[in-house]
Every structure is written in C-alpha cells, then in structure tokens.
C-alpha cells in the first residue's frame, strides 16, 4: 500500500516546528477581510517603531543632560574676555562682557573728565542680567562721595532685566579731590507703594581710573551695601491733572517712618512758577506721631501752557514750638525733577483726569533746595488740552 500524496503547496521547512498552514488557516478563519488585516498589521508596526524611537530619544537626552549639568557647575568652563588694562586693577574680573554676569548682573558705563570745567561726565549706557527668575522695573541712582546731597536718578524701565538707560549726568569735582572720590551706582526695583528693592551696586574709586581719555567698559555689579543711607521717612500722595480746566489736585494721604519725637508734623504743598514761589497750602497738624494720616485734598489752577514751568514741592514740617518750625524732608516733582518724582509727574500727564497715587521717600530739605537750582528743565510729552 502506498503513502498518500503530499500537496506541494504546503511544504514543511526542514528544522522547524511550525505547524504547516497555520497562518493561512488563521487568516481564512477570521471574519475580517484581508485588507483590514494588512492595515492593522501596518499600524501595529508603525506604533512599535514609534515607541522604539521615543525610548531611544529619552536615553540620548539623559546622556546629554549629565555633562551639561556638570559643566554649568564648574567655574573653569566660564568664557570671558580679559584686557591688560583694568579700570580697577585691585578687583579681579571687574570688566566683563554681558554674558559673564553673575548673580547681580553687570553695567555698561562711560567716564569722561573735563579738566577745564572740573566736571566728570558719567554715561549710563545699559545693564544686563540684573536678576534671574522674573522681570523687574529697574532704575539707577548715581552719586559721588565728595558731592553729598547731589545725585542723579534715571527713569524707570518697565518689565525688563536688561534696561537701556542712555542717560548722562555731571558732577563737579576738583582735580585735586579725584584720588579720594568714589563713584557709586545703585540699581533699584521700582515699587509704587512700598520700599524700592535694591538690585545691586557698583563702587568705583576714581583714583584708580585713568581719566586722560574717555572710558567705556562693562562692570560687574556687587551686592547692595548692608547699610543704606539714613531715611527721613516717606510721604504718600496722589496727583490728578485736567488739561481742559487746568485743575491740579494733590491729595496728601499719609506719612510714615518719620523720626520719633516729632511734636506736630504737617505737610506743606507749594507750587513754584519759573523758580519763584507761587502758591502754597498746608494740612492740619497731627500731634505726637511718626505716622500721621492726613487725607486732605488741595486744588490749584495751572494753565496748560504753564505745566512745563511748574515745580511742585511737598514738604513735611514739624512745629515744636508756637513760633518755631523745622523741615523734616521734602519731595520735588515737575519737569525739572528726576527719578521717581519725575516718573510720577509724567504718569499724571499721560493719564489725564485720573488720580495717580505713589509713595515717595523724603529727602533732606537742603538737598532738594539745591536740586531745584541745579537740575535743567526736561520737556515732557503732554496730553492734548481737550483731553
């Protein structure tokens, strides 16, 4: 008896345990059409390849991240430019490029001394990388140690860590006093209703600077000084101007942080026109307090054509005896002001008919009186008279 014939269409490969005809039988036994099975197989293949690619990318990122972290911690990998002539030779790494700024950032500064007029011109160009982790509203304050009471404040730059100042200020310093003079540049974060936050500062001994020619360099900022200048208090008030009627309204809200021991503090509001006393008003006195609350409003008629020529001075006075009064501190606003008072005045003009409130640090009376004569008038952009 012979063996039954074997179908040539389903040969069993040598050396395998697969059941002959298993896959064709499974395909034939499924209720789905063949094209659906092929499409499903292709989709499964694409999904498998995608998963493998994602896993490979994750592994590569982990391997790349580790050397970067190690490199950012090491100080030896920091790149910077050095020069053979340093403005401050006794301070290592003072000059640097903006990319090398450390925790407090850096400042670009130019210095020029006029031997004829005995003046030093300080050019504030820009700052970079002031503070990581969020934007600030920075401004700069410039002073010289030999010129007590004379300082310059820049305008506020909103929402930036790299403000561009492009402002120049001058200080009169006799050439003989240059070796002992120190230039101080302080940067602050502007806050309308609280104390301004220090961002860093630069102290540059002018005796170590070669002022025979114009200098322009980047300087690293250091931490703010632990001891801040003595404060005489703060005054909070609002300003409102209506160009069509010329009504300037000043609301004196409160003072705080005044020196203890004041008998009867009060606030005097004074308007000056073309550097001459024009109008003045004053609040009621508050007995025996270093934080008096006033909430008194005063209205002055200032024609729109005279806004650029007006100076507004708010001064806190103390009446210790019936016939004796002494100033505690003053705030000067107007087109000839600088820093935060100038910013407050500009905000009032830019937002006509709206009261703009702000808290200002009081400055010594002699300092404000001197600034009234020193500061040149700055033309501000005014609203339209019909607004």
From Swiss-Prot:
Residue ranges of the region described as Disordered: 70-99
Record topological domains on the Cytoplasmic side: 56-387
InterPro entries recorded: C2_dom, C2_domain_sf, Synaptotagmin
GO cellular component term, pick one: dense core granule
Molecular function in Gene Ontology: calcium ion sensor activity; calcium-dependent phospholipid binding; calcium-dependent protein binding; SNARE binding
Limits of the C2 domain: 103-219, 231-346
KW Cell membrane (keyword) present: yes
Gene3D superfamilies according to UniProt: C2 domain (2.60.40.150)
GO biological process: acrosome reaction; calcium-dependent activation of synaptic vesicle fusion; regulation of calcium ion-dependent exocytosis; regulation of synaptic vesicle exocytosis; vesicle-mediated transport
Positions of transmembrane segments: 35-55
Glycosyltransferase as UniProt keyword: no
UniProt topological domain (Extracellular) ranges: 1-34
Keywords per UniProt: Cell membrane, Cytoplasmic vesicle, Membrane, Repeat, Signal-anchor, Transmembrane, Transmembrane helix
Membrane topology: Single-pass type III membrane protein
Location of the protein in the cell: Cell membrane; Cytoplasmic vesicle, Secretory vesicle, Acrosome
Swiss-Prot/TrEMBL domain comment: The first C2 domain/C2A does not mediate Ca(2+)-dependent phospholipid binding.
Similarity field: Belongs to the synaptotagmin family.
Name of the featured protein: Synaptotagmin-8
Originating species: Homo sapiens
Gene that specifies this protein: SYT8
């Amino acid at each position: 008896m012979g063996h039954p014939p074997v179908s040539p269409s389903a040969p069993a490969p040598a050396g395998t345990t697969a059941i002959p005809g298993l896959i064709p039988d499974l395909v034939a036994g499924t209720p789905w059409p063949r094209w659906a099975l092929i499409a499903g197989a292709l989709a499964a293949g694409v999904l498998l390849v995608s998963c493998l690619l994602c896993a490979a990318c994750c592994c590569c990122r982990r391997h790349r991240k580790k050397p970067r972290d190690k490199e950012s911690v090491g100080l030896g990998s920091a790149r910077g430019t050095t020069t053979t002539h340093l403005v401050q030779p006794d301070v290592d790494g003072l000059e640097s490029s903006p990319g090398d700024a450390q925790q407090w950032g850096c400042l670009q500064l130019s210095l020029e001394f006029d031997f004829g007029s005995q003046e030093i011109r300080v050019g504030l160009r820009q700052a970079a990388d002031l503070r990581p982790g969020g934007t600030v509203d920075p401004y700069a304050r410039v002073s010289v140690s030999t010129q007590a009471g004379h300082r310059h404040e820049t305008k506020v730059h909103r929402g930036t860590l790299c403000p561009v100042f492009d402002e120049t200020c001058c200080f009169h310093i006799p050439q003989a006093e240059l070796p002992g003079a120190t230039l101080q540049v302080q940067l602050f974060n502007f806050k309308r209703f609280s104390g301004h936050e220090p961002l860093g500062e630069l102290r540059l001994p002018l005796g170590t600077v070669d002022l025979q020619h114009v200098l322009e360099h980047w300087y690293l900022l250091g931490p703010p000084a632990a001891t801040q200048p003595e404060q005489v208090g703060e005054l909070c008030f609002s300003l409102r101007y209506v160009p069509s009627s010329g009504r300037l309204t000043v609301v004196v809200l409160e003072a705080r942080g005044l020196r203890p021991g004041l008998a009867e503090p009060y606030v005097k509001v004074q308007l000056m026109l073309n550097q001459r006393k024009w109008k003045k008003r004053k609040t009621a006195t508050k007995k025996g307090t270093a934080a008096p609350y006033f909430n008194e409003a005063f209205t002055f008629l200032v024609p729109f054509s005279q806004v650029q020529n007006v100076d507004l001075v708010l001064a806190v006075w103390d009446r210790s005896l019936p016939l004796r009064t002494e100033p505690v501190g003053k705030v000067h606003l107007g087109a000839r002001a600088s820093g935060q008072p100038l910013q407050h005045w500009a905000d009032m003009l830019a937002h006509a008919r709206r009261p703009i409130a702000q808290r200002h640090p009081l400055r010594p009376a002699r300092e404000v009186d001197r600034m009234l004569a020193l500061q040149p008038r700055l033309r501000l952009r005014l609203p339209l008279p019909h607004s």
